[in-house]
C-alpha cells in the first residue's frame, strides 16, 4: 500500500511546489481591497494631484562657491596657414583637425588631397 501512495504524495508535493500561491488566493483578493495602513506619524508623500510620490530623496551636493579654479583648456592653438589648413566653423567629412585657430575654438582643418 505504501508504494501506491508514494507517487500520489510525490505528485501532490510537485504541484504544491509549482503553484505556491494557490493556497493563499482567497486571502489575496481580500487584501487588495483594503487600503495600505501607515503609522499615524508617517504618511506617504503626496503629489500635487494627490498621487503618491514613489521616488526617494536625492542627496544634493552643495553649490560651488568662488574662488574655484576652472580646469585648463586642453586644446592646442596652431598656425593654420603654416600647416596649409583652413580655419572654419567645423571640419567637413574626410578633413582632419590638427588644432584650433584661436581661443574662439575655430578648428584648423586639413584637406585630404
Swiss-Prot record:
GO biological process terms, semicolon-separated: defense response to bacterium
Pfam families tied to this protein: Defensin_beta, Sperm_Ag_HE2
GO cellular component: extracellular region
Superkingdom field: Eukaryota
Function field: Has antimicrobial activity against E.coli. Plays a role in the defense response in the male reproductive tract, contributing to sperm maturation, storage and protection.
UniProt family annotation: Belongs to the beta-defensin family.
Protein name (Swiss-Prot/TrEMBL): Sperm-associated antigen 11B
